[in-house]
Curated annotation (Swiss-Prot):
Organism whose genome encodes this protein: Trichormus variabilis (strain ATCC 29413 / PCC 7937)
One Pfam family in the UniProt entry: IPPT
Protein name (database record): tRNA dimethylallyltransferase
Subunit structure: Monomer.
Upper lineage: Bacteria, Bacillati, Cyanobacteriota, Cyanophyceae, Nostocales
Region named Interaction with substrate tRNA: 34-37
Amino acid sequence: MTKLIVICGATATGKSGLALNLAMRLGSVILSADSRQVYREFDIGTAKPTLAEQKAVPHYLIDICTPRETMTVADYQEQAQALINSLPVSPLLLVGGTGLYIRSIVQGMKIPRVAPNYELRSQLESLGQTTLYGILQQVDPVAAQKIHPHDPVRTLRAVEVFYVTGIPISAQQGENPPDYPILQIGLDCEMERLSERIHKRTEQMIADGLVGEVEYLCQKYGADLPLLNTLGYQEIKQYLAGEISLEAAKELIVLHTRQFAKRQRTWFRAYPQIEWFNADDADLLDIVWQRIQQ
């Protein structure tokens, strides 16, 4: 019997809604695989499940960190795997769009437990991406072959791990896939439709109070909080600073979300184990339900 059902895909494809309905049918629970929903108080801009939704179906790995704490992929993997091993429910639903979180579970990634060194990161970032990638090619050519030259996040992390440990990150990584059955379900739709979904969701976030949420978080934690420089928050922060209009902020959120969604689609499409379903299918719930019953 399948122990874990993964529901993944780009942002705004309806993963959470599908998961909620499936969990209620299965009498199951949801494990979030979203790198921002782990943080408390970051609610509207992360499309975090509402309190009513969390009451209807138990959700885990949501609101487990303060905004000033750091949740690494290794931290997430450890906590998620502990829940998978201990929760007396089967199948569990692992739901989200953070590819590394999902990959850490379904492929059993071996991840170096190296805490972020922010002073070192600041020094490395000041070198610029081109120079930093050149350093990576020198100290860890194996990792450089797997990391795109224009991927600053993974480039920085790989160089950071080398400088902290003296060992290339590629030599510290590997995979130990779990021995339990996993069904991976991906949701996707035409890019034009996805753009419409993103626009609609952005408008809903504004209506739900995103501006007030960002204003509150800036006052409580300071506008330089790293999380406030992420998608949906950085644009509203610009609006609150008087740099752009609210309409311009919304347009930027839509643009940046579309760009993010394209990267997510590329990431997930690289994994042949994922079975894809049309997010716009009127009978999506029943179609996926039939697949689960097979």
